[in-house]
């Protein structure tokens, strides 16, 4: 008789990694779209810096903490305004620090409403929309992810399938029928 193991939530480092990859990808896609809109460049050259991994991963992990503290206290509109203000603060702080080492990958000096070339008011709406997407899609779904110790090795299921004791051709009708597995290692509630 198999014992049930409660799946573990993702660690902070695992969530940080997912947030970093998400931010990095969005940065590349945004710069590609911006290049197309501004210069009608059909090559869609999306660019970013490796620093974006640290910047986005840490920023979104902090937004996650804010979400957990604020979700029962204020509505989504107010939360997204708070996230946007935090994003400006974080972008300015990390940009200012990186500029000390000549490593800041962005410069908003050409924008009319920039401050020290590190932040610009023209990005308020995109940052607000990004905050909404991050809360509603990224953070909420990432917090639902679980490590499933049982599915650590795909070999266990293969052996059960070959021996007739597993799900085999009856996929979805076993004891784990209600569980959904993203890739055999991560389980979503």
UniProtKB/Swiss-Prot annotation:
Residues in compartment: Extracellular: 39-43, 97-114
Record's bilayer topology term: Multi-pass membrane protein
Chain ranges passing through the membrane: 18-38, 44-64, 76-96, 115-135
Cytoplasmic face residues: 1-17, 65-75, 136-189
First-listed, main subcellular location of the protein, grouped into a coarse class: membrane
Compartmental location: Membrane
Membrane among keywords: yes
Cross-referenced Pfam families: ABC_trans_CmpB
Annotated GO CC locations: membrane
Record flagged with keyword Signal: no
InterPro entries found in the cross-reference section: CmpB_TMEM229 (IPR010540)
Region Disordered: start-end pairs: 158-189
Keywords, ordered alphabetically: Membrane, Transmembrane, Transmembrane helix
Family as reported in the entry's similarity comment: Belongs to the TMEM229 family.
Protein name (record): Transmembrane protein 229b
Record organism: Danio rerio
